[in-house]
């Protein structure tokens, strides 16, 4: 089955690679309209997935990721239209020069070819990735989690019909509908047809892909994100940023998981933090040094464990740890962080500059929420993933991250000297 999917995707990628920007944008517009016109079939499939997920005891954070409703589906269609408005990077000349030999040489952006994406209970990823791949002339093979297989199947059916209506190959977007995990291993070895693989899931999935894949892999999306509050910050300015980072969408990979606080402000700041987090229903997981300042506050406070520092909460839980100073905060982030998104809240220019230089994360913020790590917020449109590695892309992966380049040389019957 996967062999045939791979062959079909590769053939489709050759057709997509030569489409004009106008042709691709027209197809994306039809896809967006079709998603809205066929929303009920997608929502019905999602309702079945949600019911089964609840029966299987899926945790609230994952249920939130799985859920589609009319508003979320409309937002997904709007994201596709936003991709239409983005500049098509395919065909752009990155740089060029005329050499002494007389050869005119340039680097030009081209599609990758076929992209494979493995993800979990995120039905929006199906559309986001399909739109970005089509915009950049790539075919895509999707393998969503077993929790979303009905939703994904219904969504891909709508997309494929839209492609057919536009005279484009339906197999440009394919989904592995069988939830059998053995098919993941088979996909990892489909290097004859798939040019890049992106796993969007937990540490176990990333480890499996790194160890077993014969396809180049880009990993990311695991976000143990930190905010360090230093001793110069204005409390009234800091608390709303912390709230936004933790509460806006706790199940997101760019939400705050660990708050590091300079010990010099603990006595004044932590009681206020407790009151603020209590109103938001946040449970604080504090170290031995921080707990005495939180014990009398209204927010639920428990002892943090070593494992807590390594894991994503993806819920209304927040680790709180006191720091001796800047160096200890950076050391903590280096040890426990996942190189996703980390921030400092400070009024010190020197501290801000050091944090930017010394914290080796994909995205580093000064006086801003970690929630900004998002393709839409960065002006990239929808994102295919947030890469936490350094090759071939880093941070939110928009259109350019789904391209490579080729060297093109022009001569006049030129021979090498």
Swiss-Prot record:
What Pfam family does this protein match (any one)? Answer: Aldedh
Q: Which domain of life is it from?
A: Bacteria
Cite the entry's keywords alphabetically. Amino-acid biosynthesis, Cytoplasm, NADP, Oxidoreductase, Proline biosynthesis
**Annotated function:** Catalyzes the NADPH-dependent reduction of L-glutamate 5-phosphate into L-glutamate 5-semialdehyde and phosphate. The product spontaneously undergoes cyclization to form 1-pyrroline-5-carboxylate.
* Protein name (database record): Gamma-glutamyl phosphate reductase
GO BP annotation list: L-proline biosynthetic process
Q: Does the keyword DNA repair apply?
A: no
| GO cellular component entries | cytoplasm
Protein location: Cytoplasm
Matching InterPro entries: Ald_DH/histidinol_DH, Ald_DH_C, Ald_DH_N, Aldehyde_DH_dom, Glu-5-SA_DH, GPR_dom
Species whose genome carries this gene: Sodalis glossinidius (strain morsitans)
- Family assignment? Belongs to the gamma-glutamyl phosphate reductase family.
Which SUPFAM superfamilies does UniProt cross-reference here?
ALDH-like
Pathway assigned to this chain's UniProt record: Amino-acid biosynthesis; L-proline biosynthesis; L-glutamate 5-semialdehyde from L-glutamate: step 2/2
